[in-house]
């Protein structure tokens, strides 16, 4: 089941959970989508600023599998 997250802080909290498995990053011309797979939900965060997206990508937990989709 998908759920959209509006705040970056909430997304980082979800990324640090034990049941978080993988993150897919989808880049567009206008925005970047971060999709994190947890056991029950697929959480999505849409970031419109490319610099913020790069900072968020670097602040993801190191044990998480990151896959970039174009």
UniProtKB/Swiss-Prot annotation:
Q: What is the lineage of its organism?
A: Eukaryota, Metazoa, Ecdysozoa, Arthropoda, Hexapoda
Transmembrane annotation, as ranges: none
Sorted UniProt keywords: Ribonucleoprotein, Ribosomal protein
This protein's superkingdom? Eukaryota
One GO cellular component this record assigns the protein to is: cytosolic large ribosomal subunit
Q: What is the name of the protein in this document? A: Large ribosomal subunit protein eL38
Q: Spell out the Pfam families in the cross-references.
A: Ribosomal_L38e
Q: Name one GO molecular function term.
A: structural constituent of ribosome
Q: Which family does it belong to?
A: Belongs to the eukaryotic ribosomal protein eL38 family.
GO BP annotation list: protein-RNA complex assembly; translation
């Amino acid at each position: 089941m998908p759920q959209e997250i509006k705040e970056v802080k909430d997304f980082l909290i979800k990324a640090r959970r034990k049941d978080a498995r993988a993150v897919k990053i989808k880049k567009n011309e206008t925005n970047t989508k971060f999709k994190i797979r947890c056991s029950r939900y697929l959480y999505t965060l849409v970031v419109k600023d490319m610099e913020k997206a790069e900072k968020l990508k670097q602040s993801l937990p190191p044990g998480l599998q990151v896959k970039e989709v174009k």
